[in-house]
């Protein structure tokens, strides 16, 4: 049995009104009682929260809303001790516009790592490269970066540039 948990709304261990990793850890006994074999844990990485954590700014850190690295380490250890596996919801499609990679690549077009994201020149009319629309918003899937004068692709929010 796989049980998906969105930490923000699952359980709040520090009484700040926001669910956190400590809250998940506190409820492991209940999940064991339910017969859960694995937890699918929605994003808890450092994020500006434009899309509730799916706009990851740092894949190697825990957002302070949810706790700290020690909290995820403890959750993993306790879950494994109870025979529960964790599946971490990793977002490989895009990052936050505040991710260091994207921030660096907005400075210019000469960096060879620029191909890590999808960049295109404007169309001959000066607009977006094509008429694609973002999935969740009634906006184009392209946003013009004023520094480089190129558009970047975002299939979701403009704050979530797509990785190539």
Please describe what each predicted stretch is.
Residues 1-164:
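Acidic/aromatic-lined carbohydrate-recognition and catalytic surfaces
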């Amino acid at each position: 049995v796989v049980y998906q948990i969105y930490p923000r709304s699952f359980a709040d261990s520090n009484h700040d009104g926001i669910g956190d990793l400590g809250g998940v850890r506190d409820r492991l006994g209940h999940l064991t009682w339910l017969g859960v074999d694995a937890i699918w844990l929605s994003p808890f990485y450092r994020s500006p929260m434009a899309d509730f954590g799916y706009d990851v700014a740092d894949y190697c850190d825990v957002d302070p809303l949810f706790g700290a690295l020690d909290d995820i380490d403890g959750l993993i250890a306790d879950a494994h001790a109870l025979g529960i596996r964790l599946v971490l919801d990793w977002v490989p499609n895009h990052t936050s516009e505040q991710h260091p990679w994207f921030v660096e690549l907005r400075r210019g077009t000469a960096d060879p790592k620029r191909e890590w994201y999808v960049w295109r020149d404007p169309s001959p009319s000066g607009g977006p490269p094509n008429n694609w629309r973002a999935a969740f918003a009634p906006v184009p899937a392209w946003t013009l970066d004023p520094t480089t004068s190129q558009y970047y692709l975002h299939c979701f929010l403009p704050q979530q540039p797509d990785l190539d």
